[in-house]
């Protein structure tokens, strides 16, 4: 059964984005969608605004171990983020606070983020994108700075030394000194009754009050002795620090993509006493550590593991994926939940309404009275009987805004069985006169990409258009039995086909093919190739052609594939029909606006344009009514920049942006 909260509080306006509790006092720190940072004193119910941004939301709030300081990330501009500190000045019980002014403690080159205090109060860890080590492109003249992030630390006291430099010390003594302790007035001795109580009930672990020397703190920055990379988290432990690193991989994943490897991160631990860095775990998405720093939890896809923090897992346990106390893996299959769907759907509906109210791009919601809209559609909640009807209700409500990119997708739908059909990358038609299924067209696609060509185009098969398909897996085909029926559950599997070439005696032959899971990319490639062939034939090779399917990863890849190989043509047709949108249109426009300034002329060979890969010919853009979102913006920008003629139909017209970071309670 649902339970009512024991106590409620008056919170700041806007949506609460992050909420972090103090390890020592009854305090909560809240960041809001209105770009403010607040502290809620649970004891008094009072809320104090600590800081606000004029650029973007404040992120990554974290308390010091004694609860007297707060660190967080704040934008200085759209291009710079820095770490800030606020001294909360709490009394001994945390009931009263006198917060100081926010102090910027890092001098960013690009982005400083993810602060975390050393549990012993010596350092503040953080991540920073400030390494400009160019990685040269292998297909064009250009560089990228994909590995720009490193972990760093700030020494919080002037006397604290660089922990990566070995310090002389006596055998058995700690290599790093304890942090300075702010002196406090002596407290009264406990009375006899208190002495008789269990110590765990009357006393919490003694944590010295942290002293931070703010003067010159920006200059007390130390980099970790690790290579730059794609780091995402840094977490302090006693005499150790954890950080996660994500591998640098291509953006296109899955079947037919260039990157099918595991995209999850690596969890590292640096031991200050040993001055060693080693891998704790692989395939890590996110890490959490309890307040004592003794236990860590990490997510691996849909799995959760709990281990002793900072301790290397023995090999026999690392390879043990079965749930147990020893391995640390939780058995989530044991979890059972009871759901009142009417209550859940009601909450989800209101949350969807609230998200639009808070985040729609203009405050007036395009003149729509959003409260009236809520009452109109909320009255239908009691009449819906399925999850899909809830989706329909939310869609209809959002449709009142008359805007683009107002989506709702995913969620807790009942499992529906899947019957994947193996694809042959071909069009087949049954011919009654021949009593056979005939290959009308074979989509060869890119024969050099394993998942993007017809399996019939593999070397040695010699299957041609107009050949007959007689059997699949030894089962005969006829007018009432189609290839699709016999390819159910055969997607991605090796299948035996019996094929015949008409007009040849004893031409029946058996071949083994591995069917495709999806043949969309194979058909798409054939379509692009046919368009290119037509343009080249009609222009005698003087004009090039390329298609951009979206303004995302696939689109930027297709653009460069076509552009770089045809940049020296006298003209170039750019086709954005059916473009599904995205965000990379500025990158494409940047390429198209570059023009020749001169030539590099070698003694032998052909002159090369300067700058490299720049156009010398005319441009034409083809578009249609199915070109949308960033495809809209690209088409309009192409016209505004007068890059060339635009031919086709008016585009979709949906350029209100999207923010897909929010989820409803069932995962929607």
Q: Which residues does each PLM region occupy?
A:
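Blade/loop signatures of beta-propeller domains
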Residues: 1, 194-217
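A flexible loop/linker signature enriched in serine peptidases of the S9 family
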Residues: 1-16, 23-44, 51-58, 65-84, ...
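A short helix->beta-strand "capping" segment at the edge of beta-propeller domains
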Residues: 4-8, 208-227
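Short coil/turn segments that connect the beta-strands within blades of beta-propeller domains
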Residues: 24-26, 66-68, 120-122, 239, ...
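Cleft-lining beta-strand/loop regions that shape enzyme active-site pockets
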Residues: 359, 446-456, 470, 475-667
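PDZ/PDZ-like peptide-tail recognition elements
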Residues: 404-451, 536-537
């Amino acid at each position: 059964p649902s339970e009512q909260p024991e106590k409620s509080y008056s919170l700041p306006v806007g949506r609460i984005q992050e909420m972090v509790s103090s390890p020592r006092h009854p305090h909560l720190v809240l960041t809001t969608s209105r770009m403010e940072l607040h502290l809620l004193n649970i004891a008094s119910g009072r809320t104090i605004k600590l800081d606000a941004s004029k650029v973007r939301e404040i992120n990554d709030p974290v308390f010091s171990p004694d609860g007297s300081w707060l660190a967080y990330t704040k934008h200085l501009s759209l291009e710079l983020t820095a770490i800030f500190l606020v001294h909360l000045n709490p009394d001994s019980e945390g009931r009263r606070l006198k917060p100081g002014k926010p102090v910027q403690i890092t001098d960013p080159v690009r982005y400083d983020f993810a602060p975390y205090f050393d549990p012993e109060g010596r350092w503040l860890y953080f991540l920073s994108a400030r390494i400009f080590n160019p990685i040269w492109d292998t297909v064009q003249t250009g560089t990228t700075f994909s590995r720009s992030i490193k972990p760093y630390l700030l020494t919080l006291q002037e006397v604290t030394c660089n922990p990566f430099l070995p310090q002389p010390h006596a055998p058995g003594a700690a290599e790093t000194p304890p942090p300075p302790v702010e002196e406090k007035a002596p407290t009264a001795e406990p009375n006899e009754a208190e002495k008789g109580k269990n110590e765990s009930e009357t006393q919490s672990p003694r944590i010295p009050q942290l002293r931070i020397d703010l003067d010159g703190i920006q200059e007390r920055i130390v980099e970790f002795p690790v290579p730059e990379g794609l780091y995402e988290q840094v977490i302090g432990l006693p005499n150790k620090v954890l950080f996660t690193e994500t591998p640098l991989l291509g953006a296109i994943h899955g079947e037919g993509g260039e990157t099918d490897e595991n995209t999850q991160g690596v969890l590292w631990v640096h031991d200050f006493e040993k001055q060693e860095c080693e891998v704790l775990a692989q395939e890590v998405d996110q890490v959490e550590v309890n307040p004592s720093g003794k236990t860590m939890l990490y997510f691996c896809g849909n799995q959760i593991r709990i281990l002793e923090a900072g301790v290397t897992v023995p090999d026999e346990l690392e390879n043990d994926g079965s749930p147990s106390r020893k391995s640390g893996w939780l058995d989530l299959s044991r979890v059972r939940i009871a759901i009142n769907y009417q209550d859940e759907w009601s909450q989800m509906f209101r949350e969807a309404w609230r998200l639009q109210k808070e985040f729609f791009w203009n405050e007036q919601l395009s003149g729509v009275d959003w409260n009236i809209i809520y009452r109109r559609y909320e009255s239908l909640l009691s009449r819906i009987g399925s999850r899909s009807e809830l989706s329909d209700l939310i869609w209809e409500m959002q449709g009142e805004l008359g805007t683009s990119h107002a989506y709702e997708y995913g969620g807790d739908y009942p499992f529906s069985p899947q019957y994947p059909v193996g694809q042959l990358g071909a069009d087949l038609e049954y011919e009654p006169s021949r009593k056979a299924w005939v290959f009308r067209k074979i989509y060869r696609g890119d024969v050099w990409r394993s998942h993007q060509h017809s399996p019939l185009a593999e070397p040695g098969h010699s299957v041609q258009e107009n050949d007959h398909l007689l059997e699949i897996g030894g089962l005969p085909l006829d007018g009432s039995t189609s290839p699709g029926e016999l390819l159910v559950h055969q997607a991605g599997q090796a299948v035996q086909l019996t094929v015949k070439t008409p007009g040849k005696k004893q031409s029946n032959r058996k071949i083994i093919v591995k069917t495709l899971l999806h043949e969309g990319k194979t058909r798409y490639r054939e379509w692009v190739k046919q368009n290119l062939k037509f343009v080249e034939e009609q222009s005698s090779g003087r004009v090039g052609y390329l298609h951009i399917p979206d303004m995302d990863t696939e689109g930027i890849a297709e653009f460069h594939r076509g552009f770089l190989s045809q940049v020296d043509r006298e003209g170039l047709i750019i086709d954005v029909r059916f473009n599904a949108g995205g965000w990379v249109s500025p990158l494409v426009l940047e390429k198209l606006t570059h023009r020749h300034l001169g030539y590099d002329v070698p003694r032998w060979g052909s002159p090369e344009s300067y700058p490299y890969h720049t156009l010398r010919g005319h441009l034409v853009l083809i578009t249609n009514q199915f070109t949308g979102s960033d495809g809209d913006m690209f088409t309009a920008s192409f016209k505004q920049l007068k890059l060339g003629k635009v031919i086709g139909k008016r585009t979709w017209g949906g350029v209100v942006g999207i923010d897909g970071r929010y989820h409803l309670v069932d995962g929607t």
